[in-house]
Amino acid sequence: MTQNLSQLEHNDAFIQRHIGSSAEQQQQMLAAVGANSLSTLIQQIVPADIQLPSPPPVGEAATEHQALAELKGIASQNQRYKSYIGMGYSPVLTPPVILRNMLENPGWYTAYTPYQPEVSQGRLEALLNFQQLTQDLTGLDLASASLLDEATAAAESMALAKRASKLKDANRFFVADDVHPQTLDVVLTRAETFGFEVIVDRAEKVLELDGVFGVLLQQVGTTGELHDYSALLAELKKRKIITSVAADIMALVLLTAPGKQGADVVFGSAQRFGVPMGYGGPHAAFFACRDEFKRSMPGRIIGVSRDAAGNTALRMAMQTREQHIRREKANSNICTSQVLLANIASLYAVYHGPQGLQRIAGRIHRMTDILAAGLQQAGLALRFTHWFDTLTVEVKDKAAVLARALSFGINLRTDIHGAVGITLDETTSREDLQILFTLLVGDNHGLDIDLLDAKVSQNSQSIQTGMLRQEPILTHPVFNRYHSETEMMRYMHRLERKDLALNQAMIPLGSCTMKLNAAAEMIPITWPEFAELHPFCPPEQAAGYQQMIGQLSQWLVQLTGYDAVCMQPNSGAQGEYAGLLAIRRYHESRNQASRHICLIPSSAHGTNPASAQMAGMSVVVVACDKQGNIDLHDLRQKAGEAGDELSCIMVTYPSTHGVYEETIREVCQIVHQFGGQVYLDGANMNAQVGITTPGYIGADVSHLNLHKTFCIPHGGGGPGMGPIGVKAHLAPFVPGHSVVQIDGMTTQQGAVSAAPFGSASILPISWMYIRMMGADGLKQASQVAILNANYIATRLKEAYPVLYTGHDGSVAHECILDIRPLKEATGISEMDIAKRLIDFGFHAPTMSFPVAGTLMVEPTESESKVELDRFIDAMLAIRAEIEKVARGEWPLEDNPLVNAPHTQAELVGEWQHPYSRELAVFPVAGVMENKYWPSVKRLDDVYGDRNLFCSCVPISDYE
């Protein structure tokens, strides 16, 4: 054996696990594209003036087991205290059947947002269940399929109120003074850019004000007081003021639905339904409104439609409200939401059912009553007489009580003057009640729980008369059928089988980077050291989180060429918003508040103009030339016309057209020349890492899609993370937090997310990826991603023209196939090709973005040459089928393309098509051995929007 010990140790083994092609396969692909090495390929494609002289210094690769052991050591520094802090976050008991079969299952967490409904019926059904759950609990007509967090939902409710208000001259938004502080923080940030005046006071004070378009109330106040707002809501309705109510999802199980009391919008966090606190996230927010506001509603909405055979099928409804279509006129900039977490919450409700949820909520409330009675009996005063799960207890020596609590391994809420806060939850036990009583009272005799239980069960008045829910909840069969683990396991598997995820095939979506989410990267997110921490716990209890976040931030600084990173934004869209806010605040600090114009290329992603509008900027579109590059003449003209009003440009690199623009540095220089800042959208960082950086190119700020480039899974439409990297001059202006002091923040800026570090519990995924890849592996990943895209473009360019290329005919990490000439000649559209790919076992590429009538393909570095060839063979076979239509062998109205996809039910039914059953479902060799069967035929989008129905359908429709 000639290998030395270092070679045998194989510390870079994970790189070969992550990158799908072997060295031999890479050489074959290099030969096909006309390069002799990866380095040569990059030299040919990437402009020389932006190539880094050396890779970023992020260190060497570690093996999976080394990285896991290292991260375990870091996680062990987190202290798992019992947290009764509340404030919108509670410990939970995640049902193991959901943990194992969903959260730890790549069939669920590697899927993409369900833009292709035919391959997404499983998670669409789970999301429809989430909407039904939300409608039942809130008492409103329409619910969305989740928002990013409760605070973001509050800000969205304010925006909805202004859009829908009939009081067009009103510019005030009223917030009750006992909403959660982090909610108020995010609302104030959003209101600042919208130019709204926010008034914070006791709820009844709103009746003394004029010019109010919307009101935000919280049913269970942040310090625990339970409010009956029915009379106030009725009066506000008379005044045509739109009302929003923040609600606790567990409390809603027992309490009167705010919608029944007159609220127009109800929202909150679904975290308590089975999702760990995770130091702040990710968690799904629920959001519901009255039917009259449906066109103003933010976020995804799942609707019931029908397929080509007339069968019930689900789809995303009313997409014309969203950023990818309406751009700066969209209701929201949200692209990714929190699908995986919403599905966990919906399945938590399915598993427990209405009786189980009532038992859990009832137990929490009963324990709160028992503790309250014991404390009052012992002479302690409670600040409120009505509550659900939270007590504010007045104490004489607060410091001593808090010190005693810490000695018991307990966190109480500390920020209430002269009192401590205690929020109970589903994990609270009898023993916990005894400990809480002892630390507060110091009475060794303890709490007579059974005696107090008998007392409060007879005469509890902690929930007001009229505030107890009277109507039944969750009467749909789906919530009353799957309560044994066997039935639940099979139901979840049945849903999973309907969907196409990365565990079955490549998902070649352009601008989405559907790469491997390795098992080793996913393992740490369920460790209790990461999962169980409250986001507002004392910082010394989160030392492991701080170290992990600090290391990850430093790596991202090195990989982006920036000077600082902010981890707060919990999606790419939030990152865009945060970055633009930093630019806005920077200009204001220099007395240049007039700078409000944001230049955006015509090819930009829809979130760019939507985010700019949210940040209070005016969008001016910059033209692209015939090669798809930014038109420098038009850029100079638009920048010059903007003059002292120029704020920034938003540019994606490589461009959304899939090429490395050779003039990118000149673009940056032009904008800087006119006093603007450069926002470089990080959507395509997978073609930059290790090769160049935004900072080296000349940008000032970027967001990073950790759910693209750095391996956080898409989860079927979330979670995501969108931290921003900034140059030093923008660092003082990144988001801060009103509850937690963030290290390094020299000025206090408003928050964009509820938690200080966003969805902190999924950051270990990106930490693991970078640690296991090292500098060399990260660069190689980018190189192979570029190789794979060029290999596909080279193999397919004769059959499908590649719309945009660089000067040498190359592309970056994705390519755009132009279907327009084919459609004009044959009538076959990009939609037909996308749906036919399902029969071949593939998710479609991105359709009609950034150019209508095209398909954008991004293979990522994780796919093997075998899988790339399988996709290429499918596309070539489809091209041959199109030729048959062109020659008249198949009629345009009846052929495998326009009829795609084909289902099992169709296969065994009556067959009158001019092509065989075998060709329909097994179009090429190899499909049979791993056949994906869609559960529905092509969706009827027009029917779905004309007949909007967004609740659960009869169970028979699924059978």
UniProtKB/Swiss-Prot annotation:
Keyword terms of this UniProt record: Oxidoreductase, Pyridoxal phosphate
One function term, GO molecular function aspect: pyridoxal phosphate binding
Enzyme class: oxidoreductase
Domain of life of the source: Bacteria
Catalytic reactions on record: N(6)-[(R)-lipoyl]-L-lysyl-[glycine-cleavage complex H protein] + glycine + H(+) = N(6)-[(R)-S(8)-aminomethyldihydrolipoyl]-L-lysyl-[glycine-cleavage complex H protein] + CO2
Annotated Gene Ontology cellular component terms: cytosol; glycine cleavage complex
Gene3D superfamilies in UniProt: Aspartate Aminotransferase, domain 1 (3.90.1150.10), Type I PLP-dependent aspartate aminotransferase-like (Major domain) (3.40.640.10)
One Gene Ontology biological process: glycine decarboxylation via glycine cleavage system
Sites bearing N6-(pyridoxal phosphate)lysine, chain numbering: K708
InterPro entries: GcvP, GDC-P_C, GDC-P_N, GDC_P, PyrdxlP-dep_Trfase, PyrdxlP-dep_Trfase_major, PyrdxlP-dep_Trfase_small
EC number per UniProt: 1.4.4.2
The protein's required cofactors: pyridoxal 5'-phosphate
Subunit details: The glycine cleavage system is composed of four proteins: P, T, L and H.
Family: Belongs to the GcvP family.
HAMAP family: GcvP (MF_00711)
Function: The glycine cleavage system catalyzes the degradation of glycine. The P protein binds the alpha-amino group of glycine through its pyridoxal phosphate cofactor; CO(2) is released and the remaining methylamine moiety is then transferred to the lipoamide cofactor of the H protein.
Record-given protein name: Glycine dehydrogenase (decarboxylating)
Species name: Yersinia enterocolitica serotype O:8 / biotype 1B (strain NCTC 13174 / 8081)
Taxon lineage: Bacteria, Pseudomonadati, Pseudomonadota, Gammaproteobacteria, Enterobacterales
